[in-house]
UniProtKB/Swiss-Prot annotation:
The lineage of its organism: Eukaryota, Fungi, Dikarya, Ascomycota, Taphrinomycotina. Gene3D superfamilies: Chorismate mutase, AroQ class superfamily, eukaryotic. It comes from Schizosaccharomyces pombe (strain 972 / ATCC 24843) (Fission yeast). One of its GO terms (molecular function) is chorismate mutase activity. Residues 1-251 form the Chorismate mutase domain. It is found in: Cytoplasm. The gene is aro7. L-tyrosine binds at R74, R75, N134, G136, S137. It catalyses: chorismate = prephenate. Its EC number is 5.4.99.5. This is Chorismate mutase.
Amino acid sequence: MSLVNEKLKLENIRSALIRQEDTIIFNFLERAQFPRNEKVYKSGKEGCLNLENYDGSFLNYLLHEEEKVYALVRRYASPEEYPFTDNLPEPILPKFSGKFPLHPNNVNVNSEILEYYINEIVPKISSPGDDFDNYGSTVVCDIRCLQSLSRRIHYGKFVAEAKYLANPEKYKKLILARDIKGIENEIVDAAQEERVLKRLHYKALNYGRDAADPTKPSDRINADCVASIYKDYVIPMTKKVEVDYLLARLL
């Protein structure tokens, strides 16, 4: 079986999504060790940078600088990775050989992910406060969180493509009719979502515990908080990506 077909098998997709849960939780744990440090998200005089010809936030600055390097090595040529910033250089490596499993598309919700992360997720996983000495470490952790969230949410395209290929005629009718509600009804699996939330809660509860004293309740991260981030944002945003991808599937 080809690599393309393997990546679109639902059991392989679910396995990838489960591994991504681990990455997201560990990245949240890393970010939780630092206070909110709101200045790293502010622009201009409200922020923490004093650079000539740059008026943006520290987070946006480092994000763009890092993504420029990643772009050079083809990270964003992969159907699993999407940049948060623009004006990136062309890869210095040749184009990938072989066929990608996804239909060509321009779906990228990273601007929405970035806004939600700063305004909603950071306040939930970090405590109030400012630690100037750890601004750099804070933003490095932020970027890891953003990258893992983006990968998880955009992986919905693989789910959508797999479901489309399983019943193309049904999806073609819904797509041609621009029946968003009908598409949503087809892609939703409430029982699976509930299993995901229970698994996430269990992982966050245990990953946050001190290995030296596993009976002690975790104070590193709130498991209810992690599950709520998935329920209120990650899952709904993944559905949005799936729908947007399918609506463009026949173009």
